[in-house]
Regions:
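Short, strongly hydrophobic alpha-helical membrane anchors
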Residues: 1-12
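Hydrophobic alpha-helical transmembrane segments
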Residues: 16-20, 80-85, 118-119
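C-terminal ends of transmembrane helices
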Residues: 30-44, 94-108
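Loop-to-helix transition at the N-terminal end of transmembrane alpha-helices
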Residues: 44-57
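Hydrophobic alpha-helical transmembrane segments in multi-pass integral membrane proteins
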Residues: 59-71, 122-137
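Short alpha-helical packing/oligomerization segments
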Residues: 68-96
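Mid-bilayer segments of alpha-helical transmembrane spans in multi-pass integral membrane proteins
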Residues: 88-97, 121-130
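Interfacial loop-to-transmembrane junctions
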Residues: 104-124
């Protein structure tokens, strides 16, 4: 019984490495994303702006889902990091695409337009799901 318990922790160091790198990539994504948007998501969310909450939540999930896929399918930590950065770039591209499709979106989300926030969040999540599926190599 003692050996079985010990063997269960055999991959714990890998778990910690992948988790730490995932959290670093998530923090990097948040830092970059909130800087490329012309509004202050966290301040807006604290004020109760549902549009900002929808858009940021969708972007976070749209990044986390492919990042989880990268963790699951990568052959090494470096491979996972590369695919994590690709997932980050895809989410930034999704935001830029939304801005091109609906130029007023960067004004309407801070104004509390829930429909626009929901659209951006859904677009981000959808692109993230597609990215995750494409990473299942």
């Amino acid at each position: 019984m003692g050996r079985e318990v010990f063997d269960s922790f055999a991959g714990f160091d890998d778990f910690l490495v992948y988790l730490a790198l995932s959290l670093v990539l998530l923090a990097l994504f948040i830092a970059i994303y909130i800087r490329i948007t012309p509004y202050r998501e966290f301040a807006l969310i604290r004020e109760g702006n549902i549009a900002a909450s929808f858009s940021l939540s969708g972007a976070l999930l749209g990044f986390i889902v492919p990042l989880a896929s990268a963790v699951q399918h990568s052959v090494s930590v470096v491979d996972m990091a590369i695919w994590g950065v690709i997932a980050l770039a895809v989410q930034i591209a999704a935001f830029v695409a939304a801005k091109l499709l609906i130029p007023s979106i960067t004004r309407d989300i801070p104004a509390g337009n829930g429909a626009q926030g929901f659209f951006l969040g859904t677009l981000s999540l959808g692109v993230g799901l597609l990215s995750a599926a494409c990473m299942s190599f």
